Curated annotation (Swiss-Prot):
It is an enzyme of class 2 (transferase). This is tRNA (guanine-N(7)-)-methyltransferase. S-adenosyl-L-methionine binds at residues 44, 69, 96, 118. It comes from Streptococcus thermophilus (strain ATCC BAA-250 / LMG 18311). Keywords: Methyltransferase, S-adenosyl-L-methionine, Transferase, tRNA processing. Belongs to the class I-like SAM-binding methyltransferase superfamily. TrmB family. Pathway: tRNA modification; N(7)-methylguanine-tRNA biosynthesis. The gene is trmB. InterPro entries: SAM-dependent_MTases_sf (IPR029063), tRNA_(Gua-N-7)_MeTrfase_Trmb (IPR003358), tRNA_methyltr_TrmB_bact (IPR055361). The lineage of its organism: Bacteria, Bacillati, Bacillota, Bacilli, Lactobacillales.
Amino acid sequence: MRVRKRKGAEEHLANHPQYVILEPEAAKGKWHQIFGNDNPIHIEVGSGKGAFITGMAQQNPDINYIGIDIQLSVLSYALDKVLASGVENVKLLRVDGSALTNYFEDGEVDMMYLNFSDPWPKSRHEKRRLTYKTFLDTYKQILPKNGEIHLKTDNRGFFEYSLTSFSQYGMILNKVWLDLHASDYEGNVMTEYERKFSEKGQAIYRVEAQFKD
Protein backbone atom coordinates (compact mmCIF):
# COMPACT_ATOMS: atom_id res chain seq x y z
CA MET A 1 0.00 0.00 0.00
CA ARG A 2 1.53 3.27 -1.15
CA VAL A 3 0.43 6.45 0.59
CA ARG A 4 1.61 10.03 0.60
CA LYS A 5 4.35 10.89 3.03
CA ARG A 6 2.74 11.87 6.31
CA LYS A 7 4.18 14.85 8.12
CA GLY A 8 5.26 13.98 11.64
CA ALA A 9 4.93 10.22 11.10
CA GLU A 10 8.33 9.38 12.54
CA GLU A 11 7.74 11.47 15.66
CA HIS A 12 4.27 9.97 16.05
CA LEU A 13 5.72 6.45 16.10
CA ALA A 14 8.55 7.42 18.43
CA ASN A 15 6.08 8.88 20.94
CA HIS A 16 4.35 5.52 21.45
CA PRO A 17 7.02 2.97 22.41
CA GLN A 18 4.38 0.90 24.21
CA TYR A 19 3.10 -0.06 20.75
CA VAL A 20 5.96 0.65 18.35
CA ILE A 21 9.14 -1.39 18.72
CA LEU A 22 11.89 1.14 18.11
CA GLU A 23 14.82 -1.30 18.42
CA PRO A 24 13.54 -4.41 16.63
CA GLU A 25 16.81 -6.37 16.70
CA ALA A 26 16.79 -6.19 20.50
CA ALA A 27 13.34 -7.79 20.57
CA LYS A 28 14.53 -11.06 19.05
CA GLY A 29 13.79 -13.92 21.43
CA LYS A 30 12.04 -11.58 23.86
CA TRP A 31 8.60 -11.15 22.36
CA HIS A 32 6.71 -12.87 25.17
CA GLN A 33 8.57 -10.68 27.62
CA ILE A 34 7.64 -7.58 25.61
CA PHE A 35 3.97 -8.53 25.61
CA GLY A 36 4.13 -9.55 29.25
CA ASN A 37 2.49 -12.93 28.71
CA ASP A 38 2.95 -16.33 27.04
CA ASN A 39 0.07 -16.01 24.59
CA PRO A 40 0.55 -17.10 20.97
CA ILE A 41 2.21 -14.61 18.65
CA HIS A 42 0.72 -13.91 15.21
CA ILE A 43 2.36 -11.57 12.70
CA GLU A 44 1.05 -9.80 9.62
CA VAL A 45 3.69 -8.97 7.01
CA GLY A 46 2.58 -5.90 5.10
CA SER A 47 0.05 -4.69 7.65
CA GLY A 48 -0.90 -1.51 5.79
CA LYS A 49 -3.04 0.95 7.74
CA GLY A 50 -3.82 -1.59 10.42
CA ALA A 51 -7.49 -2.51 9.92
CA PHE A 52 -6.79 -6.25 9.90
CA ILE A 53 -4.30 -6.42 12.75
CA THR A 54 -6.46 -4.19 14.96
CA GLY A 55 -9.63 -6.09 14.16
CA MET A 56 -7.97 -9.43 14.87
CA ALA A 57 -6.63 -8.12 18.17
CA GLN A 58 -10.12 -7.03 19.18
CA GLN A 59 -11.59 -10.42 18.27
CA ASN A 60 -8.83 -12.40 19.97
CA PRO A 61 -7.55 -10.71 23.15
CA ASP A 62 -5.64 -13.87 24.13
CA ILE A 63 -3.41 -13.68 21.05
CA ASN A 64 -0.51 -11.26 20.61
CA TYR A 65 -0.33 -9.54 17.22
CA ILE A 66 2.58 -7.86 15.48
CA GLY A 67 1.95 -5.67 12.44
CA ILE A 68 4.95 -5.34 10.14
CA ASP A 69 5.35 -2.73 7.43
CA ILE A 70 8.41 -1.00 6.01
CA GLN A 71 6.61 2.26 5.13
CA LEU A 72 6.80 4.93 7.79
CA SER A 73 3.60 6.80 6.93
CA VAL A 74 1.55 3.63 6.57
CA LEU A 75 2.67 2.37 9.96
CA SER A 76 1.77 5.69 11.54
CA TYR A 77 -1.81 5.28 10.30
CA ALA A 78 -1.85 1.77 11.72
CA LEU A 79 -0.81 3.25 15.05
CA ASP A 80 -3.81 5.60 14.88
CA LYS A 81 -6.12 2.59 14.60
CA VAL A 82 -4.42 0.78 17.46
CA LEU A 83 -4.69 3.84 19.70
CA ALA A 84 -8.34 4.43 18.80
CA SER A 85 -9.26 0.79 19.44
CA GLY A 86 -7.67 0.63 22.86
CA VAL A 87 -6.26 -2.86 22.27
CA GLU A 88 -3.20 -3.80 24.27
CA ASN A 89 -2.21 -6.98 22.41
CA VAL A 90 -0.65 -5.31 19.35
CA LYS A 91 2.87 -4.20 18.56
CA LEU A 92 4.06 -2.50 15.38
CA LEU A 93 7.35 -3.09 13.66
CA ARG A 94 8.90 -1.05 10.87
CA VAL A 95 11.15 -3.59 9.15
CA ASP A 96 11.53 -5.38 5.83
CA GLY A 97 9.66 -8.66 5.56
CA SER A 98 12.66 -10.33 3.93
CA ALA A 99 14.75 -10.06 7.11
CA LEU A 100 12.41 -11.54 9.70
CA THR A 101 15.09 -13.83 11.14
CA ASN A 102 16.81 -10.68 12.41
CA TYR A 103 13.84 -9.99 14.68
CA PHE A 104 12.44 -13.41 15.60
CA GLU A 105 14.05 -16.55 16.97
CA ASP A 106 13.39 -19.94 15.40
CA GLY A 107 9.82 -20.95 16.16
CA GLU A 108 9.02 -17.73 18.01
CA VAL A 109 6.04 -16.89 15.79
CA ASP A 110 2.94 -19.10 15.97
CA MET A 111 1.07 -17.90 12.87
CA MET A 112 1.55 -15.45 10.04
CA TYR A 113 -0.69 -13.56 7.64
CA LEU A 114 -0.01 -12.23 4.16
CA ASN A 115 -2.81 -9.91 3.09
CA PHE A 116 -2.99 -8.28 -0.32
CA SER A 117 0.75 -8.41 -0.86
CA ASP A 118 2.23 -6.68 -3.90
CA PRO A 119 1.82 -9.28 -6.68
CA TRP A 120 4.91 -8.15 -8.60
CA PRO A 121 3.38 -9.45 -11.86
CA LYS A 122 6.47 -9.15 -14.06
CA SER A 123 8.55 -12.32 -14.30
CA ARG A 124 11.78 -10.47 -13.61
CA HIS A 125 10.38 -9.47 -10.21
CA GLU A 126 9.41 -13.00 -9.13
CA LYS A 127 11.97 -13.05 -6.32
CA ARG A 128 10.24 -10.05 -4.72
CA ARG A 129 6.94 -11.88 -4.28
CA LEU A 130 6.33 -12.68 -0.62
CA THR A 131 5.51 -16.29 -1.48
CA TYR A 132 8.73 -16.91 -3.40
CA LYS A 133 10.76 -19.83 -2.05
CA THR A 134 13.41 -17.73 -0.31
CA PHE A 135 10.68 -15.97 1.68
CA LEU A 136 9.19 -19.36 2.54
CA ASP A 137 12.59 -20.42 3.88
CA THR A 138 12.46 -17.46 6.26
CA TYR A 139 8.87 -18.06 7.32
CA LYS A 140 9.54 -21.73 8.02
CA GLN A 141 12.42 -20.78 10.27
CA ILE A 142 10.49 -18.41 12.53
CA LEU A 143 7.32 -20.52 12.64
CA PRO A 144 6.94 -23.72 14.69
CA LYS A 145 6.80 -27.17 13.13
CA ASN A 146 3.62 -27.42 11.08
CA GLY A 147 3.28 -23.63 11.24
CA GLU A 148 0.69 -21.95 9.05
CA ILE A 149 0.48 -19.03 6.64
CA HIS A 150 -2.93 -17.52 5.93
CA LEU A 151 -3.01 -15.51 2.71
CA LYS A 152 -5.65 -13.26 1.14
CA THR A 153 -5.49 -11.44 -2.17
CA ASP A 154 -7.67 -10.04 -4.93
CA ASN A 155 -5.09 -10.94 -7.59
CA ARG A 156 -5.87 -14.28 -9.26
CA GLY A 157 -2.43 -14.55 -10.86
CA PHE A 158 -0.62 -14.00 -7.57
CA PHE A 159 -2.97 -16.42 -5.83
CA GLU A 160 -2.32 -19.19 -8.35
CA TYR A 161 1.41 -18.49 -8.17
CA SER A 162 1.30 -18.72 -4.37
CA LEU A 163 -0.62 -22.01 -4.41
CA THR A 164 1.99 -23.45 -6.75
CA SER A 165 4.86 -22.06 -4.69
CA PHE A 166 3.43 -23.49 -1.46
CA SER A 167 2.84 -26.88 -3.08
CA GLN A 168 6.29 -27.06 -4.66
CA TYR A 169 7.79 -26.22 -1.28
CA GLY A 170 6.01 -29.26 0.15
CA MET A 171 3.40 -27.34 2.11
CA ILE A 172 -0.13 -28.60 2.70
CA LEU A 173 -3.00 -26.50 1.36
CA ASN A 174 -5.50 -27.07 4.15
CA LYS A 175 -8.26 -24.80 2.88
CA VAL A 176 -8.70 -22.77 -0.30
CA TRP A 177 -11.36 -20.15 -1.07
CA LEU A 178 -11.90 -18.82 -4.58
CA ASP A 179 -14.57 -16.35 -3.47
CA LEU A 180 -14.20 -15.76 0.25
CA HIS A 181 -17.10 -13.37 0.69
CA ALA A 182 -19.51 -15.74 -1.04
CA SER A 183 -18.50 -18.59 1.27
CA ASP A 184 -19.68 -19.55 4.75
CA TYR A 185 -16.33 -18.58 6.30
CA GLU A 186 -16.92 -16.87 9.63
CA GLY A 187 -14.80 -14.40 11.54
CA ASN A 188 -13.23 -12.69 8.53
CA VAL A 189 -11.59 -9.36 9.33
CA MET A 190 -11.23 -7.18 6.27
CA THR A 191 -8.22 -5.10 5.33
CA GLU A 192 -8.56 -1.65 3.77
CA TYR A 193 -7.87 -3.11 0.32
CA GLU A 194 -10.30 -5.97 0.87
CA ARG A 195 -13.16 -3.64 1.71
CA LYS A 196 -12.41 -1.51 -1.34
CA PHE A 197 -12.29 -4.46 -3.72
CA SER A 198 -15.27 -6.29 -2.26
CA GLU A 199 -17.44 -3.18 -2.65
CA LYS A 200 -16.67 -3.40 -6.37
CA GLY A 201 -17.82 -7.02 -6.44
CA GLN A 202 -14.33 -8.41 -6.88
CA ALA A 203 -13.63 -11.96 -5.69
CA ILE A 204 -11.28 -12.35 -2.73
CA TYR A 205 -9.04 -15.42 -2.67
CA ARG A 206 -7.82 -17.05 0.53
CA VAL A 207 -5.65 -20.02 1.46
CA GLU A 208 -4.47 -21.62 4.68
CA ALA A 209 -1.13 -23.29 3.96
CA GLN A 210 0.85 -25.39 6.42
CA PHE A 211 4.51 -26.36 6.55
CA LYS A 212 5.43 -29.99 6.99
CA ASP A 213 8.08 -31.15 9.49
